[in-house]
């Protein structure tokens, strides 16, 4: 009868450690792009909704990732990533 192979790969860091490190990196990046009162209110909302639980940590990570993605996609002034809105010439002349 076949047996499942033993885990011989490299040790992975625990999920909790990884989640906390990811949350810290996201918070540091979010502070550069969003007003602190917004982020504080988001944290308060998550805390009031989930309490001090891992579900709250996961919800905050997910929300910050979505906010950062949309922020960069729309076009962050600090980044070259995003939608570039070109100005149109008023006389109808093309820029090509």
Swiss-Prot record:
Residue segments, region Homooligomerization: 1-42
Keyword Ion transport set for record: yes
Assembly description: Homooligomer, may form homodimer. Interacts with p6-gag region of the Pr55 Gag precursor protein through a (Leu-X-X)4 motif near the C-terminus of the P6gag protein. Interacts with host UNG. May interact with host RAD23A/HHR23A. Interacts with host VPRBP/DCAF1, leading to hijack the CUL4A-RBX1-DDB1-DCAF1/VPRBP complex, mediating ubiquitination of host proteins such as TERT and ZGPAT and arrest of the cell cycle in G2 phase.
Keywords annotated in UniProt: Activator, AIDS, Apoptosis, Cell cycle, Host G2/M cell cycle arrest by virus, Host nucleus, Host-virus interaction, Ion channel, Ion transport, Modulation of host cell cycle by virus, Phosphoprotein, Transcription, Transcription regulation, Transport, Viral penetration into host nucleus, Virion, Virus entry into host cell
Function: During virus replication, may deplete host UNG protein, and incude G2-M cell cycle arrest. Acts by targeting specific host proteins for degradation by the 26S proteasome, through association with the cellular CUL4A-DDB1 E3 ligase complex by direct interaction with host VPRPB/DCAF-1. Cell cycle arrest reportedly occurs within hours of infection and is not blocked by antiviral agents, suggesting that it is initiated by the VPR carried into the virion. Additionally, VPR induces apoptosis in a cell cycle dependent manner suggesting that these two effects are mechanistically linked. During virus entry, plays a role in the transport of the viral pre-integration (PIC) complex to the host nucleus. This function is crucial for viral infection of non-dividing macrophages. May act directly at the nuclear pore complex, by binding nucleoporins phenylalanine-glycine (FG)-repeat regions.
Other information: HIV-1 lineages are divided in three main groups, M (for Major), O (for Outlier), and N (for New, or Non-M, Non-O). The vast majority of strains found worldwide belong to the group M. Group O seems to be endemic to and largely confined to Cameroon and neighboring countries in West Central Africa, where these viruses represent a small minority of HIV-1 strains. The group N is represented by a limited number of isolates from Cameroonian persons. The group M is further subdivided in 9 clades or subtypes (A to D, F to H, J and K).
Name of the protein: Protein Vpr
Keyword Cell cycle: yes
Residues the record lists as Phosphoserine modifications: 79, 94, 96
InterPro entries the UniProt entry points to: RetroV_VpR/X
Location of the protein in the cell: Virion; Host nucleus; Host extracellular space
Family: Belongs to the HIV-1 VPR protein family.
PTM notes: Phosphorylated on several residues by host. These phosphorylations regulate VPR activity for the nuclear import of the HIV-1 pre-integration complex.
A GO CC annotation given for this chain: host cell
Gene this protein is translated from: vpr
Entry-linked Pfam families: VPR
Gene Ontology process terms (BP): DNA-templated transcription; monoatomic ion transmembrane transport; protein homooligomerization; regulation of DNA-templated transcription; symbiont entry into host cell; symbiont-mediated activation of host apoptosis; symbiont-mediated arrest of host cell cycle during G2/M transition; viral penetration into host nucleus
